[in-house]
Every structure is written in C-alpha cells, then in structure tokens.
Amino acid sequence: NTNIVDVYKTATQKTDISVDDLSSDYFNGNNYNTNLYPNAIDPAIFYDKDGGMWMAYGSWSGGIYLLELDPATGQAIHPTASAKDGNVITDIYFGKKIAGGYGQSGEGPYVIYDKDTGYYYLYMSYGYLTANQGYNIRMFRSENPDGPYVDAAGKEATWGSSGHNGIGVKVLGSYNLPCLAYKYMAPGHNSALIDDDKMFLV
C-alpha cells in the first residue's frame, strides 16, 4: 500500500504536505475525477528492452496509466513531478497516462516488446461487456515503453475526443461464421506472446 501524501512528500522533498496540497484535479466536486484518473484494476507488468520493469494499469473513463517499478522490490518508482502535455498527464501518484480516458471506454492493457521490430505494442479493450457493440481489441505501438503509443494512422492512444471509434488498429471483435455453432461475443482483456518465430494472441 502507498499513502498518497507520503508519495508527494518523497517526490517533492517537502515534509509539510497535507491532503489539502494535493492536485485539485483529483476531484470533481466531492467525487473522485474518473474522467482524468484511473481505476486501480487490470494491472499488466512488462519488461523493456533494457530490463526495466513497468506496470500498465487502469480502466475505463480515466484511462490507462503507466508506472515504472523497481525490479528488486516490485515497488512503484513514482514520477518526481506532475505535468500535462496535451492529453498526456504525468502524475506524481498515478504515473503517466498512455491511453484512453476523458470519459471513454478503454481497459485491460497489455504491453509487449518485439525485439525484431523494435516496438512496444499496447493492446486494449474498447467497448462494453455486452452483445451489442461489445468489447473489441485494439493495438497501438511505440518506440518507448512510456509512449507515445500510436496506431497505423499516427493517432495517439491518448486522443481525447468525444469517442474513440476512430483510433487504434482493430485486432478482434465480435464475429459469427456460418460454420460455427456459436457466435463469439465481446472478445477482450487479451495478452500476447512471442515464441521463437511465432506470435500468439491470448
């Protein structure tokens, strides 16, 4: 467990910080600001090409965030300052937003590095767990573990429009084939595996 005030004290090297000193963006009135900051679910840990350890996590309206981890302890290495650059938020406590948010769907992140292409691939599930317009898996890529992640058209995964229908490479969605006894509905929350000369979507 981490105490947000303690994280702020460590990051800023100030000892006189209280809850009142935290970012006002964390709140929307008396409620947590779910459009800007993540739900603490769906963690996925990966290693970068140099052995660095990272955790992508979060879901739905607040987007996907990334924290670097200490490989020896598994503890988060929090950013030392907060910043905002367009739709990319870097937060002392939550880490760096790499995708989604702004009230739109997007969850179940999974990041994998492919040494042959030199890219990190981010998979995410968009949509809902429903039969109509259910989950679909989309992919983005980046040359760096912390982004920016973009699709084939160059659109960033942090694109903050009123909808996310126009971004990401759609890898898989609901489908029905005449030879199948059942329809496949709302595939999502995938992982991926590279084994020798083969790649697998799990």
What positions do the PLM features span?
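Carbohydrate-active catalytic/glycan-binding domains of CAZyme proteins
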Residues: 1-202
